[in-house]
Amino acid sequence: VDEAAPPAALKALALRLLETGLTISWWGNIRFEEAFSPDLARLLAASGCIALTAGLEAASDRLLERMKKGITVDQTARVAAAFHQAGILVHAYLMYGCPGETIADTVDSLERVRQLFANHLLQSAFWHKFTATAHSPIGLNPAAEGLTILGPTFEGFAENDLRHADPNATCPPWLGEGLRAALLNYMEQAGFDIPSQRWFSHRVKPPRVTKTWLTQALAASSDVPLTAERRCVWIGGRPVIAATGRTRTRVILPTRTEDFTISLASPHTEWLLRFLHESTPSLSRRNHAYPRLAEVRDRFPAAGARGFDRFSRGSAWQSMRQAGLLLV
């Protein structure tokens, strides 16, 4: 059983909450999947999501691959950044003492976690010692990792922790003590200037992770492509016609924190108002699909898809996106 909520399910939940106008605060448990785009993060936040928890585990690509987690550390950083930008708090489950993990791996992981906290991409975390579970890849095939399962017999979900022996383990008690001390400081936004290896009572080598790891990981992120099948959802306020001229109309797009003003040709204004109305969550939308981007392109006045492509590269479209037009 995987209790992590999939992106599609949370998207559906967020839309239903917005459609019904139900105002609640909620949080959930997820996997750091790249399907959690910046736009999806904004949708979740608009529906009342205030926090999410997820497993970063060993914070090492090599160990995440061995555990078959299906995520990378760079990917985790980008997803956490999307939630941070949307105002959603992130709690990470961390793990040390994994099969095959060296002390150098653990020090590297601490440096990555330090950078995530220092840049406010994590707000809280808990670092626990590895435990095999009954239906994890390691629990199902412990011999592949050199482990011996000592018991107990599996008794159902939430009763699935297994005791194990690992003759190759490199996990002395002082390692966990150092991790806990560092994490306590990081959660208080303190201790970032202390070198990672200084948290441990025994001598360890400096981390192999560069100080610019996070900057590089986030720089590798690209904007969500204008995929034709994405649905358009408007979470901004109702547009206001500010002024109408002979050929152009000034439209205000209100949000909770600021207003965005755009100037459009008159035919484009009519298209915009209809488009945003069709994209706004409401009770009347519950039985109707939100417009796909492909449909929006085809209905663009005058030049159709080609004209829309030019329009989407302009400042008006960018203001619409900032004001609450999501592609999810």
Segments predicted by a language model, with ranges:
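Flexible glycine/acidic-rich beta-alpha junction loops that bind and position SAM and/or redox cofactors
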Residues: A8, R62, R66-M67, Y96-A104, ...
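Acidic/polar loop patches that form or flank catalytic/metal-binding clefts of enzymes
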Residues: S25, H91, H120-W127, P195
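Radical SAM enzyme core and accessory elements
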Residues: R163-V328
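Conserved SAM/AdoMet-binding glycine-rich loop
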Residues: V1-L89, C98
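A glycine-rich phosphate-binding loop feature that marks nucleotide/adenosyl-phosphate handling sites
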Residues: D2-P7, R31, F126-A134, F200-V204
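A structural motif corresponding to the C-terminal end of an alpha-helix
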Residues: S47, V79-V90, L116-L121, A181-D193
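Catalytic cores of alpha/beta
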Residues: D39-A41, G100-Q115
